[in-house]
């Protein structure tokens, strides 16, 4: 029986929105279930550096550096040929022909955003590129603090872009501590982070299948 790869692109034009944080945590969650590869197409290589610091005995997704369109194209083709179940693409924060091509390959595009004025002001260009790809897509709220005024206002603002909010990662110390240590925030004993990451992974797959 053949296995169809689920290709999830994590994309935003704005740096600092938590794009790699979302990509790494989705890849970790799916790696617990099935073969998973994280294609690191961001020139900063944050996901690649994260894997280098990861404990050798920890269950991990395969992380493949993809410097440029041809490398990403080869890696994605190979992942599909080898029937890797989950393929997460961490895309660079800019617009280019490479981005358009990779977005078009996605089964689902997730757009991380923080509930801040700076993020929301710059999100239109990201959304325009996502809509142009004609792929399923939605927002992930990152570093979310529900008690803040901005958090209460973000729902109506994002609704104007005709994309659903798929899920949330909270503003937790565990996430900022985990990545520099080669870990996920949910691997540091934070039970709320554990629940949050697995819930997000399930919601992303539901969106992939049902949107």
What are these regions (language model features)?
Residues 175-198:
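Inter-lobe coupling/hinge region of RecA-like P-loop helicase motors
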Residues 80, 95-117:
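Inter-motif core of Ras-like GTPase G domains
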Residues 35-37, 86-87, 109, 136-138, ...:
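Hydrophobic anchor at the start of a short beta-strand
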Residues 43-45, 117, 144-148, 173-174:
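Conserved nucleotide-binding/hydrolysis micro-motifs of P-loop NTPases
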Residues 2-17, 24-100, 179-187:
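P-loop/Walker-type NTP enzyme "switch/lid" segment
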Residues 108-111, 118-143, 149-162:
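Anionic-ligand binding region
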Residues 145, 155-183:
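Beta-strand-loop-alpha "switch" segments that mediate conformational coupling across diverse proteins
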């Amino acid at each position: 029986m053949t296995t169809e790869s689920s290709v999830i692109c994590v994309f935003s034009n704005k740096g600092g929105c938590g794009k790699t944080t979302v990509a790494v945590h989705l890849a970790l969650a799916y790696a617990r279930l099935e073969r998973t590869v994280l294609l690191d197409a961001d020139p900063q290589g944050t996901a690649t550096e994260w894997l280098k610091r990861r404990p050798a005995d920890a269950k991990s997704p395969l992380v493949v550096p993809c410097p440029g369109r041809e490398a990403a194209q080869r890696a994605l083709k190979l992942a599909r040929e080898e029937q890797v179940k989950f393929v997460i693409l961490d895309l660079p924060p800019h617009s280019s022909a490479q981005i358009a091509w990779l977005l078009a390959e996605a089964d689902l595009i997730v757009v991380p955003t923080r509930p801040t004025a700076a993020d929301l002001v710059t999100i239109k260009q990201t959304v325009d590129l996502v809509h142009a790809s004609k792929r399923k897509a939605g927002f992930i709220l990152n570093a979310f603090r529900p008690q803040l005024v901005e958090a209460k206002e973000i729902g109506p603002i994002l609704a104007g872009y005709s994309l659903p909010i798929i899920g949330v990662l909270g503003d937790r110390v565990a996430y900022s501590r985990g990545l520099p240590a080669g870990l996920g925030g949910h691997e540091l004993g934070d039970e709320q982070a554990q629940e949050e990451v697995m819930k997000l992974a399930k919601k992303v797959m539901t969106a992939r299948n049902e949107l």
